[in-house]
A protein has these predicted regions:
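Secondary-structure transition motifs
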Residues: 91-120
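Single conserved hydrophobic/aromatic residue that forms the stacking wall/gate
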Residues: 191-198
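A short, conserved structural fragment
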Residues: 160-170
């Protein structure tokens, strides 16, 4: 496990952060998230990672091993345990979690993102070709869109929430996920989404 944050609170009982970038290593693969609430309880050796409701914190956990975007409310892992539990928040009325393959295509999302000036996913893909990479400063993308960073920030949060990009607001960097390119190019692929309920 790797965790990174601008601010960790460390005391005798726990290690915590309101916003941490995390990476679970699974052999050559990983489960990652750009900005979860991080809490490690020392007494029970248990780590709880909680997604937020909006912006970067609402982004899915990306599972490169199973090639899934995962949308549980929280992930709970006891050190040394081979199992990671997905659980709802205490008192949560919604006990559903969603897992979507990287090739899953939702026409409603695509249409929702499409505006008078076209679809931002297509624009970002074209920008990566021109830029020569899939990670870049947010200022470069804003210039390509002919807007200010502030003008496109809401869009970046929204695309992060959908799992198309990771926007690191602290470092002002954008990295495109495989899902962005799949969404544009693989509409004819087999699409799979797995809604589930916590037990």
């Amino acid at each position: 496990l790797y965790a990174e944050s601008i601010n960790f609170i460390i005391n005798d009982e726990e290690i915590s952060s309101e916003r941490a970038k995390v990476k679970f290593f699974i052999e050559q693969d990983s489960i990652t998230h750009p900005a979860v609430t991080f809490k490690y309880a020392k007494s029970i050796k248990t780590l709880t990672l909680t997604r937020g409701d909006d912006g970067i914190s609402a982004a899915p956990f990306y599972n490169s091993y199973h090639r899934l975007d995962m949308y549980p409310q929280s992930m709970i892992w006891k050190l040394g345990d081979p199992i990671i539990n997905f659980e709802p928040l205490p008192l949560a009325s919604d006990n559903r979690a969603q897992f979507a393959s990287l090739n899953f295509f939702d026409q409603r999302i695509f249409d929702d993102l499409t505006g008078n000036t076209g679809n931002p996913l297509v624009k970002i893909k074209n920008f990566t070709i021109e830029y020569g990479g899939t990670e870049f400063p947010v200022t470069a993308l804003a210039n390509y869109f002919r807007k200010t960073v502030q003008d496109i920030q809401f869009l970046l949060f929204k695309l992060t929430e959908y799992g198309f990009i990771n926007y690191d607001d602290d470092r002002k960097l954008v990295s495109c996920s495989e899902k962005l390119f799949n969404y544009i190019e693989t509409v004819s692929y087999t699409h799979l989404t797995l809604p589930t309920r916590y037990r």
